[in-house]
């Protein structure tokens, strides 16, 4: 799968509520009402990621969870990352 151009990424971002491009990846941080709500969201995203065989990097800090998407094997952001960002929004709410 090809790495997306800057223009393609910029065109996709308006449809990805809460996501930004930072440090070569798509990133979104979400603050949950409680630590366990964040953990539950991570579990739901992890189950979906397993089914798609495309896994985000996930950072958990008390009630804040940050998802980062980049296709390491391709060396950049691909359509799979854009699709997974959209899927994550559907799972956790935009």
Swiss-Prot record:
One term of GO molecular function: 4-alpha-hydroxytetrahydrobiopterin dehydratase activity
Gene3D superfamilies: Transcriptional coactivator/pterin dehydratase
Pfam family, one: Pterin_4a
InterPro entries noted in UniProt: PCD_sf, Pterin_deHydtase
Protein name in UniProt: Putative pterin-4-alpha-carbinolamine dehydratase
Protein origin, superkingdom: Bacteria
Enzyme class of the recorded protein, top EC level: lyase
GO biological process, alphabetically ordered: tetrahydrobiopterin biosynthetic process
Species, as recorded: Mycobacterium avium (strain 104)
Keywords: Lyase
Reactions mediated catalytically: (4aS,6R)-4a-hydroxy-L-erythro-5,6,7,8-tetrahydrobiopterin = (6R)-L-erythro-6,7-dihydrobiopterin + H2O
EC number: 4.2.1.96
Family, similarity comment: Belongs to the pterin-4-alpha-carbinolamine dehydratase family.
């Amino acid at each position: 799968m090809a790495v997306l151009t800057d223009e393609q990424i910029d065109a996709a971002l308006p449809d990805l509520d809460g996501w930004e491009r930072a440090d070569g990846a798509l990133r979104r941080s979400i603050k949950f009402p409680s630590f366990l709500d964040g953990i539950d969201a991570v579990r739901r995203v992890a189950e979906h990621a397993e089914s798609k065989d495309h896994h985000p990097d996930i950072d958990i800090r008390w009630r804040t969870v940050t998802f980062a998407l980049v296709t390491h094997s391709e060396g950049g952001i691909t359509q799979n990352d854009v699709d997974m960002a959209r899927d994550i929004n559907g799972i956790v709410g935009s």
